From Swiss-Prot:
CDD domains: PIN_ScUtp23p-like
Name of the protein in question: rRNA-processing protein utp23
GO biological-process terms attached to the record: rRNA processing
Gene name for this UniProt entry: utp23
Function field: Involved in rRNA-processing and ribosome biogenesis.
Entry similarity comment: Belongs to the UTP23/FCF1 family. UTP23 subfamily.
InterPro entries on file: Fcf1/Utp23, PIN-like_dom_sf, PIN_dom
Region (Disordered): 188-260
UniProt keywords, alphabetically: Nucleus, Ribosome biogenesis, rRNA processing
Subcellular location: Nucleus, Nucleolus
GO cellular component terms attached to this protein's record: nucleolus; small-subunit processome
Length: 260
């Protein structure tokens, strides 16, 4: 799957999570035709569905769809084996089996709502058209060996707009209740108090005068790179003697003794 398409699918499923409460693993209702087409193309159904919804899945199939596969058991042995690995969704049509499209529609569309948060994978265009009128129903089908997730339907977009409009005028407590996060009044009061204290503290810090930073002057040269000064000969205060006198210092002057 291309990166751009995967990103769009991930974003779309995130919308279903926020607005309609979808959670992983997603419950994917698969009809008999979708199962048969993917099996003939030798496509791993569970892996393909997981890539499409960008998350873990729980594949499911209704009893009516199983009956349709068993009606052609000689031709669809591989499909029946795959269907047995799916979770069986009890539709309640025991006495009289319905067509797969009617069965899936009765399971998904409960009073105009997708109560059980099903993702529907079907090749029936009439079934997809009927389920587009129900808000919050992700629809999957295969076209040219590519499994496709339909964009959000008009009913889903309208429901999204209505919920966003309602949330704009809600208080903090009402938004938490709508999102399913129940918190006590004491916790909300503590949060409000913490917010107020942090705001006051920020205002106090802004009003306090800021101490001027001491500007650093130009740095001196590196002492290791300076050439050492040459030591000068220190002069003594002792007077210098002439050369002819220096040699006579310490020597006794010899006198001849005069004899009488």
């Amino acid at each position: 799957m291309r990166q751009k398409r995967a990103k769009n699918y991930r974003k779309l499923m995130h919308t279903y999570q926020l607005l309609f409460g979808f959670r992983e693993p997603y419950q994917v209702l698969v009809d008999a035709d979708f199962l048969k087409d993917l099996s003939q193309q030798k496509i791993d159904i569970q892996a393909a569905l997981a890539r499409t919804v960008q998350g873990a899945i729980k594949p499911m199939i209704t009893q009516c769809c199983i009956r349709q596969l068993y009606s052609k058991s000689d031709e669809l042995k591989q499909e029946i084996r795959i269907a047995k690995s799916f979770e069986r969704r009890r539709c309640g049509h025991i006495d009289e089996a319905l067509s797969p499209s009617e069965c899936i529609q009765s399971v998904v569309n409960i009073n105009g709502r997708n109560k059980h948060r099903y993702v529907v994978a079907t090749q029936d265009p009439e079934l997809r058209q009927a389920l587009r009128s129900v808000p919050g129903v992700p629809l999957i089908y295969m076209k040219r060996s590519v499994v496709i997730l339909e964009p959000a339907s008009r009913a889903t977009l309208l429901e999204k707009h209505n919920k966003e409009s309602v949330q704009m005028g809600m208080s903090k407590e009402e938004k938490l209740l709508l999102s399913g996060k129940k918190r006590s009044a004491n916790e909300l009061a503590i949060d409000d108090q913490d917010t107020k204290e942090s705001t006051d503290l920020a205002g106090t810090e802004d009003s306090a005068p800021k101490a001027n930073k001491k500007r650093k002057g130009p740095k001196g040269p590196n002492p290791l790179s300076i050439k050492k000064r040459s030591s000068k000969n220190h002069t003594t205060d002792e007077p210098t003697l002439p050369v002819n006198i220096i040699g006579d210092v310490g020597e006794r002057k010899k006198h001849r003794r005069k004899r009488k």
